[in-house]
Amino acid sequence: MGALKMRCQCFPLPYLSLLALLLLNLSLTRAETLWTANVNYSYVYDNKTYGEEGEIGVFGQDSPIERAAGLVVLPKSEKLYTACKDNVNFSVPSGWTGPWIALIQRGGGCTFTEKINRAAERGARAVVVYNNGIDNEVFEMSHPGTKDTVAIMIGNLKGNEIVDLIKGGMQVTMVIEVGRKHGSWINHYSIFFVSVSFFIVTAATVGYFIFYSARRWRLTRAQNKKQKRLKAEAKKAIGKLQLRTIKQGDKVLGPDGDSCAVCIEPYKPSDVVRILTCNHFFHKNCIDPWLLEHRTCPMCKCDILKSLGIAEDEEEGTSVAIPSVSSELQRSTVQITEEENHSETASSGYASVRGGDEQVDEGQHIYENTELVHEASATSIEVLPHMDNPGFESEDVHVHEMKS
């Protein structure tokens, strides 16, 4: 369906309408165009040649528009001058071997096609039909199916004049030349207008397609470039976030313990979690791919790039010192209100790895209660190497210890 829809969009309705109108005009051009015929006939009388020439004929609609010449011949019987009978014959002089032209009268109850075909079957090179009436009025005949026989119409007066010459014993020869092309000036201008409109619409369609394709290519390229840059910045920002290992005894493992908001799996001892700038934490293997694509906390939508100042550095071109969460190893006080702002409950917050009722002494590490070790000697906080994440194998490993 998508491919079909795309094809339909490539040929809009105005484009198809103009094309149909152009084809219609071209088909009507032949019907509205009229070709005249220059007729030159001559005869010999008293050792002198007489003749007449003029644009007195009209080619038929289905006639070849070409030159024809020969001896003018009438049907043998005056009753058959219309050539509507199958037994019609023409009075071709004996011994005449050249081309001849049949002169036939209009009417008689048969069609122009029948008249022309009967004359052509008997050897006529061309057919001249003279009109009825009392003047030289002519029109364009319709005679489909006459193949390559040249057919023209002349007026009644001129036709009877030639008939009288032949009946008087004169041998009349005729040359039919192609005259001028006549047509409605409105038809010519309409064809010109439709043709110009067709090419304008075609050029506009092609131009718009090129512009749209180039613009879409530029936008796609810019978007891909931006995504690569943001992914690189996210990779840099992830490297500045802390990693912690959950150990037996942490509050997050208790009866009210929470689960990872990404994979919906409960936390277990030895799970490695990554702590975001908003103090929400998640499984490292769950949150790292998420941050590479979205760069925000799944819980509160906090943007890690803006929180760490990386995005502003890229846009403003200034160098800003970025304190990481892992660099704040000592805090004098911890405000309960700050913890409530970051996580209203122990669910999916850094407070869930701490005792809710414990007091934090001055100089005590902020993550002192993240790992509980049942030994009297020391409490150890382990920061895992980033080698667990293939994207950060080049970073260093830091181990911090605190005396209880």
Swiss-Prot record:
Region of interest called Disordered, as start-end residue ranges on this chain: 336-356
Tissue specificity annotation: Expressed in the cement gland, cranial placodes, and the pronephros.
Pfam families: PA, zf-RING_2
SUPFAM superfamilies in alphabetical order: PA domain, RING/U-box
Domain of life: Eukaryota
Catalytic activity: S-ubiquitinyl-[E2 ubiquitin-conjugating enzyme]-L-cysteine + [acceptor protein]-L-lysine = [E2 ubiquitin-conjugating enzyme]-L-cysteine + N(6)-ubiquitinyl-[acceptor protein]-L-lysine
Signal peptide interval: 1-31
Bilayer-spanning residue ranges: 191-211
Description of post-translational modifications: Auto-ubiquitinated.
Function statement: E3 ubiquitin-protein ligase that catalyzes polyubiquitin chains. Converts epidermis into cement gland and neural tissue in whole embryos.
Protein name: E3 ubiquitin-protein ligase RNF128
This protein's encoding gene: rnf128
